[in-house]
Amino acid sequence: MAVRSRRPWMSVALGLVLGFTAASWLIAPRVAELSERKRRGSSLCSYYGRSAAGPRAGAQQPLPQPQSRPRQEQSPPPARQDLQGPPLPEAAPGITSFRSSPWQQPPPLQQRRRGREPEGATGLPGAPAAEGEPEEEDGGAAGQRRDGRPGSSHNGSGDGGAAAPSARPRDFLYVGVMTAQKYLGSRALAAQRTWARFIPGRVEFFSSQQPPNAGQPPPPLPVIALPGVDDSYPPQKKSFMMIKYMHDHYLDKYEWFMRADDDVYIKGDKLEEFLRSLNSSKPLYLGQTGLGNIEELGKLGLEPGENFCMGGPGMIFSREVLRRMVPHIGECLREMYTTHEDVEVGRCVRRFGGTQCVWSYEMQQLFHENYEHNRKGYIQDLHNSKIHAAITLHPNKRPAYQYRLHNYMLSRKISELRYRTIQLHRESALMSKLSNTEVSKEDQQLGVIPSFNHFQPRERNEVIEWEFLTGKLLYSAAENQPPRQSLSSILRTALDDTVLQVMEMINENAKSRGRLIDFKEIQYGYRRVNPMHGVEYILDLLLLYKRHKGRKLTVPVRRHAYLQQLFSKPFFRETEELDVNSLVESINSETQSFSFISNSLKILSSFQGAKEMGGHNEKKVHILVPLIGRYDIFLRFMENFENMCLIPKQNVKLVIILFSRDSGQDSSKHIELIKGYQNKYPKAEMTLIPMKGEFSRGLGLEMASAQFDNDTLLLFCDVDLIFREDFLQRCRDNTIQGQQVYYPIIFSQYDPKVTNGGNPPTDDYFIFSKKTGFWRDYGYGITCIYKSDLLGAGGFDTSIQGWGLEDVDLYNKVILSGLRPFRSQEVGVVHIFHPVHCDPNLDPKQYKMCLGSKASTFASTMQLAELWLEKHLGVRYNRTLS
């Protein structure tokens, strides 16, 4: 009985064992095979997601079914021109380019496979090669590609199989370039050597069946000679037959098809990224929407709401559009209403493809057509946002400009990569600090956080001076440079790129914020080169704020941008073989740590949040003027003060420190003049502080500043100055309490009797040239400083009597106190010429400085040399040369 009761349980156990054994033999291998296929098919779309991959995204997408083609539409296969020629220098012998962009490294050679691609590599069953085309092999002659045509532009990112998971299918985009026999060696060759190499697919050039020019070797191009087609213009038949060729030979091999001109430039990486976000199984017709010129409106046979894609920037067709449209090309050729091939292609797509060119406004930016005034057939201005945002650029009819544009695009990419290296150095330095490990020397040099305070000067001659600039002019105190000059092309280009990157950072999240900010102009700015770190900018930008969410608003705003272009690691390429051992021995080991300094590409980075300048800083400026005698000069100063401050009602206060001798008679006129202005402007703040004894500028300024609180903004001024309103604003902007003191470099006039040849001086004092004056870069008397910073630095040395030296002493104290002196040319102030009288009783050091200042005010070195030659040699020179 016990044995019989166990029989059902033994049967169940035996059945389970047999069932699991059969499942492992029959079912498990099939499941593993299906999982492997699914993994291969989905890995190609992992970057953009399954929804953007079209019919290859998964099994739920039905495969497109080929349509039957009318017999009369079948044309004989076009003749293929095997144009033999030297291989392109960029191509490696026997290796197909696997790069989807020029900066992606190709996979190892062993990852390539012979024959057709395996099923799952593209998401579709492996398609056989086109009729008459041999399968691609690994080995081959230099420049050989598929179909045996030399120089064929069949590019891609990988072919599946053993490729890396990030590899993408090669057969993604087919580009047909329309050209003519006369342009094969110029425009077509330029396109092949520039953008065509970076298309994620194949690029072929379509021309007529005419024989090439006799006596000239054909260029190394993949040329398709269309039968029965010539190079006449307009190329309507050529365009339709090229589209038919794409359909007949590559419909099931590529997802997207593009018709392009030979004078267009295409950014392959941006185009691939854009197209992978769309579904090629849907009928899509992409390009810049066109309606015709103003003269042609109503004459193109377009109904209201109909359009076409302009042929210049390029037309892009999805696979489904070609599947629907091409069987009816014969009917489209017989029923044309205009001579414009792009209009007729658009009409055919709309009629038989079931779609038309997209109406999206953004297409005008992505497919860029150059509408510059007085177009010359090439894109001249490269430093603007339109060039950077575009995918295709048209036209560049001259090959030299095509190479120029390509070189600029490569340089932009190099700059982005170098900036990325700087970011990585910063991250590495930060992680070393967080992990309490030693920071490498390279990270110490290149991973520093941007700042204006990397270099702390210890003496006044170590202070790096700033150059003042406007949108068109540069004011510099550098040796052997004119004080006022136009912006050089190099500096203008650098400013354009700088502003362009600033605007990209400002508008990075413009769509989500519902606003857009446009650049108008540079109001003014400062620039200097820190040889240890990079170029530094302070720019006052005039912008337009446009709000497009909610209540629409457009207002002008100003921003104060603090920027730095950092030096990155230099890269060298030796054109000759060098003896490394002898080279190492000849290099000083002490200079190796500074090898990162070079005149290399600089990358813009924002290291301080842009300070919005919606309204001016209206801090009250307290103008302190020490004075003794010189009533006529004081009268001129007060007239200028009235025009610049009293009439415009500037937020200023004038303090006159009036020194007088024992008699006091020489100060009575000054007091009456001040009282007259006080009566005329009762609300104006003007104060006169009388002082007895010998003149001491430092003592007078120290006594006057002692009457104000610590938050007072002080301007130490001289009676010989003529200034404008903008100088007062820059005094406010460039002085930062506790951080920065503004030391403007003043333009000083020469003796007008010498510069004008005895003629009376002009009324316009603000004329900057080598003939009229010079930048007083050795003067530190004019200062904008807060009272608290003056006290922190130690104040003036009141023991200094007479002329000079007190300003140099205060400047040294400012540096030693840790404050940052801001030095730049100030175009809003001019030091008017006056005869200098040096007292022999002065301190020897002061007396020597006074004589040097007196000698520098006569005239320029060139003018003095001319005067001497005229007097002693009787030779007349042209004074305008200076």
Swiss-Prot record:
Function, as annotated:
Has both beta-1,3-glucuronic acid and beta-1,4-N-acetylgalactosamine transferase activity. Transfers glucuronic acid (GlcUA) from UDP-GlcUA and N-acetylgalactosamine (GalNAc) from UDP-GalNAc to the non-reducing end of the elongating chondroitin polymer. Specific activity is much reduced compared to CHSY1.
| Family statement | Belongs to the chondroitin N-acetylgalactosaminyltransferase family.
Compartment(s): Golgi apparatus, Golgi stack membrane
Biased region (Low complexity) positions are 59-69, 120-131
State the residue spans of region: Disordered: 46-167
Q: Does the keyword Transmembrane helix apply?
A: yes
UniProt entry tagged with the keyword Heme? no
Protein's UniProt name: Chondroitin sulfate synthase 3
Q: TM segments? A: 8-28
EC number(s) per entry:
2.4.1.175, 2.4.1.226
The UniProt entry lists membrane topology as: Single-pass type II membrane protein
Supply the source organism for this entry.
Homo sapiens
Q: Which residues are glycosylated?
A: 155, 279, 710, 878
Let me know which tissues express this protein, per UniProt: Detected at low levels in brain, cerebral cortex, uterus and small intestine.
- Cofactor(s) listed: Co(2+); Mn(2+); Cd(2+)
What gene is behind this protein?
A: CHSY3
Which keywords label this protein?
Glycoprotein, Golgi apparatus, Membrane, Metal-binding, Signal-anchor, Transferase, Transmembrane, Transmembrane helix
Could you tell me which residue ranges are on the Lumenal side of the membrane?
Answer: 29-882
